[in-house]
Design a protein with these regions (language model features):
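Alpha-helical transmembrane segments of multi-pass small-molecule/ion transporters
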Residues: 1-314
Length: 314
């Protein structure tokens, strides 16, 4: 079982690293230059991520496997962690742009990519309904908080109206709102439209990983080393330690507890890099957080899964 848990963690993140490595190769071979990387990244932000947000919500029936107690706990814990992260980062970092990237890197996990593989590998694909429903609840909150955070910490002192306008015009927010409207109004798109949105949504994560690899510069790590260590410690150790301890004390077990592992112990969300770069935050720090948190999460997620399994909690 020890080896099985390690394999689960590695298999969940290995494809991400392979695609990022392809991005590094593409850039090194000169197939794409720095300006093209930025243009493609903007296309991902404006076209692919909104399609992904819409597709994550469109056609979903939230009531089938909805666990109100788990949802309330996860949302409440996320709110508490977000507030604590903001307070902490404001104390340890003075740069506005770095603040936004750090807050996002610590609170915002890669739940979409990590959640399904982890639960499926431990409990089987027949037990994915609860996790899938939680994705439709937690991921939009992740994204709204990210837009709010990066808009506020763009630099200077923006007016509240400017911040609100930036949030409302954000492509990911627009995609999420359209998805929620489609669910609320029971709108059924024609098959060709569903297929088109689905294709764009499916391209979002691999393209983001490819461009992340293409934009990665090992020399930039030295500049962001201090903040990178802070973010990795928060994302992979502090946040899961607090959230999972509270989850165990609250009585969550089995699929519900492993879903909390996926929410709070996963590495930093891939889309945080694209958003940071496109919203004038510290893109180098955000990219480094995605890469290194994904790397170290093979060990830390294995540790959390093994510890919970050893205590017979699932």
């Amino acid at each position: 079982m020890l080896l099985d848990n390690l394999v689960i963690s590695v298999e969940a993140v290995a494809p991400m690293f392979i695609v990022m490595a392809v991005g590094v190769f593409v850039r090194r071979k000169g197939f794409i230059n720095e300006q093209e990387v930025k243009r493609v990244n903007r296309m991902i932000f404006l076209v692919l991520f909104p399609a992904l947000m819409f597709n994550n919500l469109y056609g979903k029936e939230l009531s089938d496997a909805f666990n109100p107690r788990l949802a309330a706990f996860a949302v409440g814990m996320l709110a508490a962690i977000y507030i604590a992260t903001v307070v902490f980062v404001l104390k340890v970092e003075k740069s506005q742009k770095s603040r936004g990237a750090m807050i996002q890197a610590i609170y915002r996990s890669n739940f979409v990519i990590m959640g399904i593989p982890i639960v499926s590998n431990i409990f089987g694909s027949e037990n994915l309904a609860m996790t899938s429903v939680m994705i439709t609840i937690i991921v939009p909150i992740f994204n709204v908080l990210a837009v709010v955070t990066l808009e506020i910490f763009r630099g200077g002192r923006p007016s509240p109206l400017h911040v609100i306008a930036g949030i409302l015009k954000n492509p990911m927010i627009i995609g999420a709102v359209l998805g929620m409207l489609a669910v609320a109004l029971n709108i059924k798109l024609p098959d060709f439209a569903e297929n088109t949105v689905g294709m764009l949504a499916n391209a979002a994560t691999p393209m983001a990983l490819l461009i992340l690899g293409a934009s990665f510069n090992i020399n930039s790590v030295e500049r962001v080393k201090r903040n990178l260590i802070i973010c990795l410690t928060g994302r992979l150790i502090a946040v899961p330690a607090i959230a999972l301890t509270c989850g165990v004390l609250a009585g969550f077990r089995g699929v519900a507890l492993v879903t909390l592992v996926a929410i709070f112990a996963s590495p930093t969300a891939v889309s945080s890099f694209t958003m940071a770069q496109q919203m004038d935050s510290d893109g180098e720090l955000a990219g480094a957080c995605v890469i290194f948190s994904s790397m170290f999460s093979c060990l830390t997620m294995f540790g959390w899964i093994f510890a919970l399994k050893s205590f017979g909690l699932f």
